[in-house]
Amino acid sequence: MEKLTILLLVAAVLMSTQALIQHDGEKSQKAKMKFLTARTLSAKTRGVDCVGLSSYCGPWNNPPCCSWYTCDYYCKF
């Protein structure tokens, strides 16, 4: 009976961990889509290839781009 309880506890912890990892992946995907949308709109209105990313860099929004190298990578996406 103790082994069953331990196995159920381990399974619950693993399922919780998987749910957290999946949520973080969805969050970063949404941030990337926001970035790509902003970049596209900026390019259409200003005739440039890349939107400035200072507003996207910060721990509050899990940005896809916080360095110019990464910015260049996403802008050439």
UniProtKB/Swiss-Prot annotation:
Keywords of the record: Disulfide bond, Knottin, Neurotoxin, Secreted, Signal, Toxin
Keyword check for Ligase: no
A GO MF label: toxin activity
Domain of life: Eukaryota
Subcellular location as annotated: Secreted
One GO cellular component term: extracellular region
Primary residence: secreted
Tissue: Expressed by the venom duct.
Disulphide-bridged cysteine pairs: 50-66, 57-71, 65-75
Signal peptide (residue range): 1-19
Propeptide: 20-46
Similarity field: Belongs to the conotoxin O2 superfamily.
Domain notes: The presence of a 'disulfide through disulfide knot' structurally defines this protein as a knottin. The cysteine framework is VI/VII (C-C-CC-C-C).
Protein's name according to its UniProt entry: Conotoxin VnMEKL-0111
Lineage start: Eukaryota, Metazoa, Spiralia, Lophotrochozoa, Mollusca
